[in-house]
């Protein structure tokens, strides 16, 4: 909702007050009293009071949060006592509580429930936060205290988690410019501030491009092949937009089915081009210059800090350790999977030729369509056959029930917990002894103001302080097929897999059991964080799991054994193609961030060269991945996209133990909870994995699971 002029003026004055300007005190006190961020939340489990938070609350609360954080840091700096682990490292880890509270809500909602006003505020506040972060990481007196503890602390008196926190804290300074001279610190501030602005602009362009496009079709004949459920959803979208006929968007539940089922090749091509050119067209949403800026800024920062490349900087704190190990994994998988992937493409091409003629060339907009036709022919299976058994409410019960079966935890919806949109539900998570574990929010459907994709996030971290175990608040956000006027939300197999994936991340947060807030849950190496999520995907084709929830939404019939068998037989369909596709993204990522010199070339040409070894279909002029590759440009996966395959290596090896002992084996589940899910980054991930599995992971289990080796 747009602010009126008087409120906006008042907001600006109060924000200035928090950074030292002079103004009417009673006016600001009034703002404080009405701003929910300024007091403890009086909600169940102190959850965020979304129903009371307004756009005008963020800026003054954020500025006050910065002020409080600065005061807490100054108290650490000015402590007359000798620096110790408790008075410096622990104090620093707990500092900034109010600021964290505000920024967590603001940036999470900027992804899940944003507006033009909110995005403008994000552009305004991001540089302020970057400056504040730099003020801390470049503070010489603060770093001197941290370094004193790092250099002189008796590590024999520290627990493993405390030693890890000490190392992590020291690295957070050293890797963020604390050892630079004054002129280089000034340059570091300039570069990081510019990077925060640029990555935000990149992601906002992505959101605008996605939400601004709609393909409206008024001739039903052009939609031949589309299932009734897809047509109904498209008709509902058209109605919501005030249009006639059927409307398709670039959101996955709309885009995917048209590409998979629509017989009109030109319509498929039109939507494909819209999706794959959305941030490379000659308009205000073009991201090519932002790509260059982001790549060059990250390189400049890395080299300023003494690294040859951004990849060297990032991988220093990863399981992979260096670019050589990443490239070795990518090369191993490319060699192992490429022959099978080529065979899979050939088979789909042959399927297309049977209906289109010998001269037919398989293009990217044909892949999903003919791939689905071949799958249906080989296994008598398609998404529309299984959708009726995957009613969202039943899937939710099944996924939650899986956690109950494995870990003994239960989920109870609490409608008294405020939510930020009517689609969102909030649940209390209870441990097997009935004690409170966490709050989990679920947000399932696409809407304007919500970015595409699926993700898990935290609204509150877990930690232990003063004898109290403060439990986490986590959220899983998806973009599933929406219910229509005549049918409930019915999911595809892929959507159920996505649910399991994000729920695995949520369990990582829910079970957190560390002492310090920065050490628990998903606060782990990027190439370890996907293990808890990807291991959950392995349960999907298991008959024992499907039998717990896959009931027909109309008849109540349990999914037939014969259909389950087809799902199992089809689970490795085109698995090599999917692997090579992921490897192409990994190659592209490493190509951008292994650079040791700045880039000012053609983004499209560079991309084509980078992933050429993994290209299986023709490259289409006018399309580009990099300009919409939010993962590596603005989403935290720079020099890290390989993590998905690295974690897949881990999850295949880990789940082999479940397969060996039984998928519901309590001893294995308990070991996974105690050694992986609860530990966060309190110990090195290699140590944690070996303790759970008794061995290091290799690609062998993954290749065996995928049918690449027998």
Show which residues each predicted segment covers:
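C-terminal, non-catalytic "cap/extension" segments appended to globular domains
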Residues: 31-57, 64, 224, 245-247, ...
């Amino acid at each position: 909702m747009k602010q009126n002029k008087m409120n906006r003026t008042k907001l600006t004055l109060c924000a200035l007050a928090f950074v030292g300007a002079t103004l009417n005190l009673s006016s600001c006190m009034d703002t404080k009293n009405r701003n929910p961020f300024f007091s403890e939340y009086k909600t169940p489990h102190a959850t965020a009071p979304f129903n009371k938070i307004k756009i005008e609350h963020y800026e003054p609360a954020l500025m006050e949060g910065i002020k409080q954080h600065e005061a807490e840091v100054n108290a650490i700096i000015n402590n007359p006592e000798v620096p110790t682990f408790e008075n410096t490292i622990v104090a620093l880890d707990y500092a900034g509580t109010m600021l964290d509270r505000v920024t967590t809500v603001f940036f999470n909602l900027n992804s899940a429930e944003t507006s033009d006003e909110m995005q403008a505020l994000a552009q305004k506040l991001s540089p302020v936060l970057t400056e504040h972060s730099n003020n801390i990481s470049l503070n010489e007196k603060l770093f001197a205290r941290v370094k004193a503890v790092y250099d002189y602390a008796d590590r024999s008196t520290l627990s493993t988690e405390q030693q890890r926190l000490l190392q992590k804290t020291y690295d957070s300074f050293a890797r963020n410019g604390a050892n630079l001279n004054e002129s280089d610190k000034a340059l570091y501030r300039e570069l990081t501030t510019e990077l925060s602005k640029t990555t935000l602009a990149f992601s906002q362009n992505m959101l605008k491009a996605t939400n601004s496009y709609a393909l409206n079709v008024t001739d039903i004949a052009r939609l031949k092949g589309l299932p009734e459920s897809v047509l109904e959803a498209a008709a509902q979208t058209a109605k919501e937009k005030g249009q006639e006929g059927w409307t398709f968007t670039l959101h996955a539940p709309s885009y995917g089915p048209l590409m998979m089922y629509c017989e009109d090749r030109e319509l498929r091509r039109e939507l494909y081009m819209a999706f794959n050119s959305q941030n490379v067209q000659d308009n205000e949403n073009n991201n090519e210059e932002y790509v260059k800026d982001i790549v060059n800024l990250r390189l400049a920062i890395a080299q300023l800090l003494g690294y040859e490349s951004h990849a060297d900087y990032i991988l220093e704190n990863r399981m992979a350790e260096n670019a050589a190990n990443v490239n070795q994994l990518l090369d191993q998988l490319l060699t192992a999977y490429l022959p099978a992937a080529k065979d899979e493409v050939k088979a789909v091409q042959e399927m297309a030729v049977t209906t289109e003629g010998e001269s037919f060339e398989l293009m990217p907009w044909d892949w999903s369509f003919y791939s689905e036709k071949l799958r249906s022919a080989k296994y008598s299976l398609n998404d529309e056959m299984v959708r009726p058994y995957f009613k969202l409410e039943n899937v939710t019960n099944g996924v939650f029930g899986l956690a109950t079966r494995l870990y003994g935890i239960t989920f109870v919806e609490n409608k008294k917990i405020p939510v930020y949109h009517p689609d969102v539900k909030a649940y209390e998570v209870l441990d097997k002894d009935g004690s409170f574990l966490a709050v989990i929010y679920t947000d399932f459907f696409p809407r304007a103001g919500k970015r595409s994709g699926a993700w898990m996030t935290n609204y509150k971290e877990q930690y232990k302080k003063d004898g109290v175990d403060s439990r986490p608040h986590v959220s899983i956000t998806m973009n599933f097929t929406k219910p229509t006027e005549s049918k409930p939300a019915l999911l595809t197999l892929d959507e159920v897999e996505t649910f399991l994936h994000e729920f695995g991340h949520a369990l990582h947060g829910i079970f957190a059991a560390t002492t310090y807030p920065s050490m628990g849950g998903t606060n782990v190496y990027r190439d370890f964080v996907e293990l808890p999520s990807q291991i959950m995907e392995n349960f999907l084709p298991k008959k024992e799991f499907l039998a717990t929830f896959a009931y027909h939404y109309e008849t109540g019939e349990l999914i037939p054994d014969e259909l389950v068998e087809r799902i199992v037989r089809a689970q490795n369909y085109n698995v090599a193609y999917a692997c090579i596709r992921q490897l192409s993204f990994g190659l592209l990522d490493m190509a951008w961030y292994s650079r040791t010199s700045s880039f000012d070339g053609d983004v499209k040409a560079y991309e084509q060269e980078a992933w050429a070894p993994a290209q299986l279909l023709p490259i289409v002029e006018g399309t580009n991945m990099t300009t919409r590759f939010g993962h590596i440009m603005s989403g935290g996966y720079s020099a890290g996209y390989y993590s998905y395959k690295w974690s897949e290596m881990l999850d295949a090896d880990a789940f082999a133990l479940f397969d060996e002992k039984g998928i519901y084996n309590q001893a294995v589940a308990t070991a996974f909870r105690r050694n992986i899910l609860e530990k966060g980054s309190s110990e090195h991930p290699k140590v944690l994995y070996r303790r759970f599995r008794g061995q290091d992971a290799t690609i062998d289990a993954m290749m065996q699971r995928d049918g690449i080796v027998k």
